[in-house]
Amino acid sequence: MHGESPIKRRESRKIWVGSVPVGGDAPIAVQSMTNSDTNDVAATVAQINRLEAAGVDIVRVSVPDMDAAEAFGRIKQQVKVPLVADIHFDYKIALRVAELGVDCLRINPGNIGREDRVRAVVDAARDRGIPIRIGVNAGSLEKDLQKKYGEPTPAALVESALRHVEHLERLNFKDFKVSVKASDVFMAVEAYRLLAKEIIQPLHLGITEAGGLRSGTVKSAVGLGMLLAEGIGDTIRISLAADPVEEVKVGYDILKSLHLRSRGINFIACPSCSRQNFDVVKTMNELEGRLEDLLVPLDVAVIGCVVNGPGEAKEAHIGLTGGTPNLIYIDGKPAQKLTNDNLVDELEKLIRQKAAEKVEADAALIARG
């Protein structure tokens, strides 16, 4: 039953991506990106709906050409979650998706082209109240910066970002957020630290091309965890070569671990050893699978023996300590004993009951004003 996060977040300007606030005092938004063919409208809509069910706040969709832009418009009509169009090279694509109701444009002004083209995109965004994300990436730095620095560095990423920030500010456009991504954790972290000192715009955090499910999760947790713990970051995207739904899950798990945002069950579980009085690993796997649908933030401790079990259980909403028999704690107090027979069934029942009680209590509190 952990309280609020002790982290003091960096002050930033608030912008709106559709109905979702980003920056300022808004909760840190969790993003993902579709990996389906945008021209396959049905498949992309289905994937976005799965992401929304997982709790995503904002979804980015790649729009590589005009056919994809038209498909994007049809996709936008069929989903509720705000959509970001990922645009490179052809400014006319950005103009078209702006007409079709995009919620945010992700562009790199450096590859959109001449000043008049960038101005056209900015004017379209301003006229329709569409924010822009300046997305700088270590793998696509401008040639002059590559020549100047010899290789991607934090300073090079920040110089690129500030160049584009100044570009938008010259056009009197302030409704934007910025990212400076790299696949190297140290490079990305240092770039964000430097950039955070220079601008007030909200920052979109990510370790780009982080890797597969396991390696990408670790890289992202380390890099984003360092920044978030320092109060840097207003929205996050976990880049994984995996099902995009996993990006959302990992994103929330990172935020939960720092007490920055809660959604669903926060499990505290021991790695198990020969002292365990029930199969901890099997119990955890079953509980996680069964309770994925629960959105209510609850702390649930699953500890296999009495060494650390009582202490952890007393700090959780629901706690299980292995013993003969096993002991259940509810709100820190011993409540009932359970044998290993139907252990998971009984735990699931208690957790769902506790979640329902919390929803009812929260609703009553809101009703009282």
Curated annotation (Swiss-Prot):
<feature type="binding site">
    <location>
        <position position="305"/>
    </location>
    <ligand>
        <name>[4Fe-4S] cluster</name>
    </ligand>
</feature>
<feature type="binding site">
    <location>
        <position position="270"/>
    </location>
    <ligand>
        <name>[4Fe-4S] cluster</name>
    </ligand>
</feature>
<comment type="similarity">
    <text>Belongs to the IspG family.</text>
</comment>
<dbReference type="GO" id="GO:0005506">
    <property type="term" value="F:iron ion binding"/>
</dbReference>
<feature type="binding site">
    <location>
        <position position="312"/>
    </location>
    <ligand>
        <name>[4Fe-4S] cluster</name>
    </ligand>
</feature>
<keyword id="KW-0411">Iron-sulfur</keyword>
<keyword id="KW-0414">Isoprene biosynthesis</keyword>
<dbReference type="GO" id="GO:0141197">
    <property type="term" value="F:4-hydroxy-3-methylbut-2-enyl-diphosphate synthase activity (flavodoxin)"/>
</dbReference>
<dbReference type="Pfam" id="PF04551">
    <property type="entry name" value="GcpE"/>
</dbReference>
<dbReference type="GO" id="GO:0051539">
    <property type="term" value="F:4 iron, 4 sulfur cluster binding"/>
</dbReference>
<keyword id="KW-0004">4Fe-4S</keyword>
<protein>
    <recommendedName>
        <fullName>4-hydroxy-3-methylbut-2-en-1-yl diphosphate synthase (flavodoxin)</fullName>
        <ecNumber>1.17.7.3</ecNumber>
    </recommendedName>
</protein>
<keyword id="KW-0479">Metal-binding</keyword>
<dbReference type="GO" id="GO:0016114">
    <property type="term" value="P:terpenoid biosynthetic process"/>
</dbReference>
<dbReference type="GO" id="GO:0046429">
    <property type="term" value="F:4-hydroxy-3-methylbut-2-en-1-yl diphosphate synthase activity (ferredoxin)"/>
</dbReference>
<dbReference type="InterPro" id="IPR011005">
    <property type="entry name" value="Dihydropteroate_synth-like_sf"/>
</dbReference>
<feature type="binding site">
    <location>
        <position position="273"/>
    </location>
    <ligand>
        <name>[4Fe-4S] cluster</name>
    </ligand>
</feature>
<dbReference type="InterPro" id="IPR016425">
    <property type="entry name" value="IspG_bac"/>
</dbReference>
<dbReference type="GO" id="GO:0019288">
    <property type="term" value="P:isopentenyl diphosphate biosynthetic process, methylerythritol 4-phosphate pathway"/>
</dbReference>
<dbReference type="InterPro" id="IPR045854">
    <property type="entry name" value="NO2/SO3_Rdtase_4Fe4S_sf"/>
</dbReference>
<keyword id="KW-0560">Oxidoreductase</keyword>
<comment type="pathway">
    <text>Isoprenoid biosynthesis; isopentenyl diphosphate biosynthesis via DXP pathway; isopentenyl diphosphate from 1-deoxy-D-xylulose 5-phosphate: step 5/6.</text>
</comment>
<comment type="function">
    <text>Converts 2C-methyl-D-erythritol 2,4-cyclodiphosphate (ME-2,4cPP) into 1-hydroxy-2-methyl-2-(E)-butenyl 4-diphosphate.</text>
</comment>
<keyword id="KW-0408">Iron</keyword>
<dbReference type="InterPro" id="IPR004588">
    <property type="entry name" value="IspG_bac-typ"/>
</dbReference>
